[in-house]
Curated annotation (Swiss-Prot):
Residues 122-341 form the Radical SAM core domain. One of its GO terms (molecular function) is lipoate synthase activity. The lineage of its organism: Eukaryota, Metazoa, Chordata, Craniata, Vertebrata. It holds the Pfam family LIAS_N. Its cofactor is [4Fe-4S] cluster. Binds 2 [4Fe-4S] clusters per subunit. One cluster is coordinated with 3 cysteines and an exchangeable S-adenosyl-L-methionine. [4Fe-4S] cluster 1 binds at C106, C111, C117, S352. [4Fe-4S] cluster 2 binds at C137, C141, C144. This is Lipoyl synthase, mitochondrial.
Length: 372
């Protein structure tokens, strides 16, 4: 569960010539033309690197090691260092969360973009990813800093109402709902998530809702419950390449199970936008990355994000390699060539980072066009 400025108009999907990859997969015809257009006009890599980054002129001159040697710990390269902007939006959002006893993956997973997403600039869009079902997970993935326990506290029955109330107070047009894994509950919390989505839609029929879900231990009925709840984007992260699944994720998770979750959500609701994320820098090879991207496209996944793995604490997996911005740009092009409708690839990209802005920009433009 690796979640992860002003909106700048930029087109992501453009003609990309990768000599070795000739045949792009066709974009899914099941998506309505309106949603395809919204995704097509999303931001590019620079939108995900916007904010107060250090001087980029130092990037090329950086001579530090990018691959970890045995017994060593890598130093942070300049392109993953960023100032954390705080402001009125940040403080307002944080206070609202505390007052309503809500949690965000932004805080629990120690996301490096929390200041930018929550701050949103004085005129930007504040984005937060609400983490449902408490702050304690039943799984222990080696990359994640969220608290774990075999038997977390029971679900808060008021959480769906409080969440919808908070979103109404913020006046957001797009919200991301994620959750901890709750293997201690028969349906993994699917009904709780679905109820939250339903209440949000009751308060605001036009709000766009993305759910970043658990794998529900392969319970496809639970997947179906969430998929049919009224959400707009169904997201579930495969996290890493198949070869590293056992090393990186909890033993109860695996690549095929995650892929089946994404497939089933689309089978149930072909009009849904499906989305997943991969962390880089865990020791994967280029061949493994490309093979994974290809498998995701063949499974019908619409959107893909790729970001740098960052070790949250010394107890977690060490970073094996820091991927350069140029290499992330390479994978963005690869994703476009494979036919993903939306590929976000950059060092600080997270699956939920500023998630709504590419939708919001286009919705605003569309409304202006209708008004003329």
């Amino acid at each position: 569960m690796r979640q992860c400025g002003l909106v700048r108009a930029a087109q992501l999907l453009r003609t990309c010539g990768l000599a070795e990859w000739h045949t792009p997969y066709r974009a899914l015809s099941s998506l309505p033309d309106e949603k395809k257009e919204l995704i097509k006009n999303g931001p590019d890599l620079q939108d995900f690197l916007s904010g107060e980054l250090v001087d980029k002129s130092s990037w090329a001159a950086y001579k530090g090691d990018l691959k970890r040697q045995k017994g060593e710990r890598l130093r942070l390269p300049p392109w993953v260092k960023t100032e954390i902007p705080m402001g009125k939006n940040y403080n307002k959002l944080k206070n609202t969360l505390r007052n309503l006893n809500l949690h965000t993956v932004c805080e629990e997973a120690r996301c490096p973009n929390i200041g930018e997403c929550w701050g949103g600039g004085e005129y930007g869009t504040a984005t937060a990813t609400i983490m449902l079902m408490g702050d304690t997970c039943t799984r222990g993935c080696r990359f994640c800093s969220v608290k774990t326990a075999r038997n977390p506290p029971p679900l808060d029955p008021d959480e769906p109402y409080n969440t919808s109330k908070a979103i109404a107070e913020w006046g957001l047009d797009y919200v991301v709902l994620t959750s901890v894994d709750r293997d201690d509950i028969s349906d993994g919390g699917a009904e709780h998530i679905a109820q939250t989505v339903s209440m949000l839609k009751e308060r605001n029929k036009t709000i766009l809702i993305e759910c970043l879900t658990p794998d529900f231990r392969g319970n496809m009925k639970a997947v179906e419950t969430v998929a049919k709840s009224g959400l707009d984007v169904y997201a579930h992260n495969v996290e890493t390449v198949p070869a590293l699944q056992r090393h990186v994720r909890d033993p109860r998770a695996n690549f095929d199970q995650s892929l089946n979750v994404l497939k089933h959500a689309k089978n149930v609701r072909p009009d849904l936008v499906s989305k997943t994320s991969i962390m880089l820098g865990l020791g994967e090879t280029d061949e493994q990355i490309y093979s994974t991207m290809k498998a995701l496209r063949e499974a019908g996944v619409d959107c893909l994000t790729l970001g740098q793995y960052m070790q949250p604490t010394k107890r977690h997996l060490k970073v094996e390699e820091y991927i350069t911005p140029e290499k992330f740009k390479y994978w963005e092009k690869a994703g476009n060539e494979l036919g993903f409708l939306y590929t976000a690839s950059g060092p600080l990209v997270r699956s939920s980072y500023k998630a709504g802005e590419f939708f919001l920009k286009n919705l605003i433009e569309k409304r202006k066009t209708k008004a003329i």
